[in-house]
Amino acid sequence: MKILVDENMPYARELFSRLGEVKAVPGRPIPVEELNHADALMVRSVTKVNESLLSGTPINFVGTATAGTDHVDEAWLKQAGIGFSAAPGCNAIAVVEYVFSALLMLAERDGFSLRDRTIGIVGVGNVGSRLQTRLEALGIRTLLCDPPRAARGDEGDFRTLDELVQEADVLTFHTPLYKDGPYKTLHLADETLIRRLKPGAILINACRGPVVDNAALLARLNAGQPLSVVLDVWEGEPDLNVALLEAVDIGTSHIAGYTLEGKARGTTQVFEAYSAFIGREQHVALETLLPAPEFGRITLHGPLDQPTLKRLAHLVYDVRRDDAPLRKVAGIPGEFDKLRKNYLERREWSSLYVMCDDETAAALLCKLGFNAVHHPAH
């Protein structure tokens, strides 16, 4: 049995080699000739999986080590009798921590307290719900918008997008990309919405580029109305609008979900799905794969305030480290994908062991996802 895996999928070789022969290949463009000699294909979001890619090949299973699946024609796979699995929620924590890193940076730069801001979360799935939990642990007011969940009668105080635009100081998007249908999200943030954002508002998109109308966003920024923008995703990736990148506060190369833990979770989820598909079910403990974190442990004295949280968060991951490299190479063909391929190792907050002499600080850090313990000072 031969399994093709995206070369950017960590731990894929060591896991899938338990099931058969493994070959690592680039995800964009994928070497089509390899598909004629393989049984399974494991991809990330850069590979478009559809009839034109797989028709006439012996591939009988596709796994994507990503939460999003808009790069996969699931209907065709089903019709062709090809097994499929994604990795929902695998990088949700990573995206939440990206949003926090950006917000804490902007709050320090512009001198505001996050507790004085209302944060509107558009799309309350794996990412949005975790973001809500962490923000509320800090006493930050959130407003939720998720029409499909509201229609299903899910528990939660769901508002309309209009209400969020009127009331929220921060609008952060965490939806799938639906190009049509009743819950279409293509240009969900369209010209009208972008024009109506409060002066001084913050707009964050770390889901899919086309959820925000990039041309309309650039027009608003060029008009000189105060608006802070954080974009990890772009229309037309990998060919982003360079003028827009120059105008935003933080711009990164679709890496919000790129923690070592998130990528490893994605790989293990599709590995477990494929092993079950071929009748050789196996389970993997994530911690057995991950290396020891860079920082052993740190000690925190006293309560947890916003500057301290920012220092801890940025010790693990400062979003600015990914903004500068993109600006340097913007507009040069192939460089966007190169940044993703050669991405520096990044960990999640759970990799930081914090000893606190303040019990409340330790409890709050645990709620936020840090590995914190209360250690009274003697």
From Swiss-Prot:
User: What is the first-listed, main subcellular location in coarse terms?
Assistant: cytoplasm
Pathway this chain belongs to: Cofactor biosynthesis; pyridoxine 5'-phosphate biosynthesis; pyridoxine 5'-phosphate from D-erythrose 4-phosphate: step 2/5
Provide any one GO MF term from the record: 4-phosphoerythronate dehydrogenase activity
Where does the chain bind substrate? S45, T66, Y258
Q: What class of enzyme is it?
A: oxidoreductase
Q: How does it assemble?
A: Homodimer.
Question: Which family, according to the similarity comment?
Answer: Belongs to the D-isomer specific 2-hydroxyacid dehydrogenase family. PdxB subfamily.
Give the protein name, as stated in the record. Erythronate-4-phosphate dehydrogenase
Q: Which organism is it from?
A: Salmonella schwarzengrund (strain CVM19633)
